[in-house]
Amino acid sequence: GNFNYTLKGSTVLVIIGFLILLLIESRFHMKAPARVAKRAALILLSIVLIYGYTGMIQSESFVRSFGLYDKLFTPTVMNKRDGNIVAFLMELEYMDVEKPSGYSPEETGSKYTQAGQDSAGLTAAVEDPESVKRPNIIVIMDEAFSDLAVRGDFTTNEDYMPFIHRLQQGAENTRTGYLNVSVLGGNTANTEFEFLTGNTIGFLPQGSVAYQQYVQKETPSLASYLKELDYHTVAIHPYYASGWDRDRVYPLLGFDEFLSQDDFTNPKRIRNYISDESSFAKIIELYENKKEGKPLFVFNVTMQNHSGYEEEFHNFTPDITVDGIDSKALSMYLSLVKQTDSALQGLIDYFSQADEDTMIVFFG
């Protein structure tokens, strides 16, 4: 088959424990005074079995082998499919985070000192912080956006991201590059968490979602830092506000305001989602209505390009095809990317003519 089965220590512990329980129950018939010892032994073995069983349930290989549902985004589905006990034991894994090796104030301080020495001369000292310009900062984390050309060459009937390709050729006031993220095909909130806080999910238990498990109090982030610099901080996500607990988490990260799909009036939709064009128009609306003299920070997590890509929709017809590849999903995806490219051009063109300095950061 396609599975490789390995016996972990916790699995062996459970098997041995069950065998001992069977042996005690079948071979020993104790008199009343000795029953206390028997019960104590059974309680101890039960604790050992629970510990071992929990370890098995929390094993990634066990979860995959038995097809358990482990997506924390939908805990009700998790409970329904796996059962309440299994779901509860699986979630216990995320209650504790082990401190990474070498993590201490002394070690961290020395690394900051070294980083400062390495960057000496790259930044100029600011004598008067009040004189420093505070540009508006717009960050767009575009759902599922990527340039598939990094995976290999292919030919399309037309360019699917002409504007971004022009930017990559050295446009004025532009820096481009490639970004690796820690998630693939899900757990969008973990990329948000890493970008906003500078932390890494590499230090968290496998499968955890930082927003849901670990952001339970005010947490330093880019938003809270800019808020201290008198920025008005706004998060935008044109979908359900409760997704990944954003409505609870964003205020803890320092956002003054959170706009979800309920804050859009008659937006343009592509497939089932609010388009990037409408999402970017909301940014422009915020800029045009902001308080004069107060800089704006916007963090926009879009929805337009969310999977899946196989369905047909009355409000969107894919117009990008790939030579030699007959794939509805590929055609749909590249056509959506083209829509994003056009929307991004409109946003950048607008702020290129705006009165205030504005920095736009875009990544997928």
PLM segments and residue spans:
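N-terminal secretory/membrane-targeting segments
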Residues: 1-134, 155-171, 175-176, 212, ...
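Solvent-exposed soluble domains appended to multi-pass membrane proteins
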Residues: 120-135, 139-142, 147-364
